[in-house]
Curated annotation (Swiss-Prot):
InterPro entries: LAMTOR2-like, Roadblock/LAMTOR2_dom. Pfam families: Robl_LC7. To M.jannaschii MJ0310 and MJ1340. It comes from the Archaea. PANTHER family: LATE ENDOSOMAL/LYSOSOMAL MP1 INTERACTING PROTEIN (PTHR13323). One of its GO terms (biological process) is positive regulation of TOR signaling. This is Uncharacterized protein MJ0714. One of its GO terms (molecular function) is guanyl-nucleotide exchange factor activity. Gene3D superfamilies: Dynein light chain 2a, cytoplasmic. SUPFAM superfamilies: Roadblock/LC7 domain.
Amino acid sequence: MVESMIDRVLLELNRTDGVKGSMVVGKDGLVIASQLPGNVDAELVGAMASAAFGAAERTSSEIGLSGLEQTMIEGEHGKTLMVDAGEGILVVLTDAKVNLGLIRITMKRAADKIKAMF
C-alpha cells in the first residue's frame, strides 16, 4: 500500500522537465520504490546512493553543519540528487541541463509527502 503511494509520488516527480527517473531507498540501501529507466540497475544505484548520502551526512556532522538537506553528484551527462525522506532517501536522476531551483523545490515537496507516509 505505502509502496504504491510512493510510486505515485515518484511518477509525478518524473514528469518534471529534465528528470530521468527517481527512487526511494532505505538508509540501509534497500530499494523501497523505484521509477527508474529500464537500463538503470535500481539495486546498485540504491546501494550506492545510500552510501553516498550516509557519507555526506557524516561529513556534514563532522564539520559542524547541522541537518544535511541535499547531496548532489554532478557528471557530464547528468546529476543525481538525494534528499532525506524520513525513513528513506529520495534519489532523483536528471539530465545535465535540469533547472536546479525547480528540481529542489519539487524534490522537497515529494520528500515531505513521502515522510508523511511512514
